[in-house]
Amino acid sequence: MEHFHQIQQTIQHYQQQLAAQQQQQVQQQQLQQHQVVVQQNQQQAHQNSSNTTAGVGTQQLFTYKMASSFPNPATTMAQVVATSNAAGTTGYDYRLNMAQAAAAAAVPGSQWWYSAANQGQVDANTAAQLQHQQQQQQQQQQQQQQQHQQQQQMQQQQQQQNVINSASPMSRVKADAKPRGRMTAYAYFVQTCREEHKKKHPDETVIFAEFSRKCAERWKTMVDKEKKRFHEMAEKDKQRYEAEMQNYVPPKGAVVGRGKKRKQIKDPNAPKRSLSAFFWFCNDERNKVKALNPEFGVGDIAKELGRKWSDVDPEVKQKYESMAERDKARYEREMTEYKTSGKIAMSAPSMQASMQAQAQKAALLAAAAQQQHQQLEEQHDDDDGDGDDDENQ
């Protein structure tokens, strides 16, 4: 029971961690989206500024091209025939009303209306636009990669959540707050042993079967004085359970008193169940069958015992049926004493015989299961039904 509660707490802890991680990822996504919007606004403003600057440079260049249609006196008017005035001879100089002599003295080596500063500004704007476009492409690629990674993380988390939900026993827990079942004195003893073992050996892995066996052996060797405190704990828990059940109201439509019962730790001191006449017969005849047929396995012995039991005389069968009746009366008597006092009133010989019978019963069940498994394997090997092993052909 305690192990079940620990599993529930562990699963709840994992679910809380997953919820916190998902909330952090949502916040990170919102922050990234906000940053993307800010970057887009900045890029739009920068683009508008670049377009304005490029437009001014284009207008200036267009003006210069228009001016190139006018003749330059330093290059084109050198062979012009003289006209009625000096302007017709030298042509017009459009450079800020400079004197004719100064203009003639300062002949430019190239067309004067192409400003080097303006041309450098145009080149710089073009390079800036190309660089800005490259940065935008890189940012878009990074954003796509981040979105792809986020989608993968969300899918992995969803898969983990599905696995936890499918393996979680929380889905089988009833929605109503039904009182927890009461614990026996032996269950409190096992719980105490487990806590002591965890304190002494926190890193050691506990094997449940071995641990239960040791607890049962220790419980058998304890005296009544040592068991007293566990019986007191069980009595208090019984009172708690009865008080909670009095105040418990089942949900509407619930069926009370039905359903699968919770599996509790079995008390090793509880009376052993009675054996049937067939099992008493097997106890007497098993050694004889093994002596006559030493090559027989467990399954063969079980089959032979079943055949002999079906052929046994009615008088012999009546003998074992009487033994089964006496064992049944013994079980009922010991069970009554166990329920009234919580202790076992069994003699040592009867306890030993009962334990031996239980072991033999388990051996017979295992033999029957093994026999059925062998038959299935033989049918699988002989698929064509000819009686031969297909793998050896």
Curated annotation (Swiss-Prot):
User: Which keywords, in A-to-Z order, does the entry hold?
Assistant: Chromosome, DNA-binding, Nucleus, Repeat
The record's section on Pfam families has: HMG_box, HMG_box_2
What are the Acidic residues biased-composition ranges? 379-393
Query: Which PANTHER family does this UniProt record tie to the protein?
Result: HIGH MOBILITY GROUP PROTEIN B3, HIGH MOBILITY GROUP PROTEIN DSP1
Function comment:
Binds preferentially single-stranded DNA and unwinds double-stranded DNA.
Annotated segments matching region Disordered: 153-179, 364-393
One GO term (biological process): negative regulation of RNA polymerase II transcription preinitiation complex assembly
Major localisation: nucleus
Q: According to its UniProt record, which protein family does this protein belong to?
A: Belongs to the HMGB family.
Protein name, please? Answer: High mobility group protein DSP1
Q: Which gene encodes it?
A: Dsp1
According to its record, what are the GO cellular component terms?
nucleoplasm; nucleus; polytene chromosome
Quote the Gene3D superfamilies the UniProt record gives: High mobility group box domain (1.10.30.10)
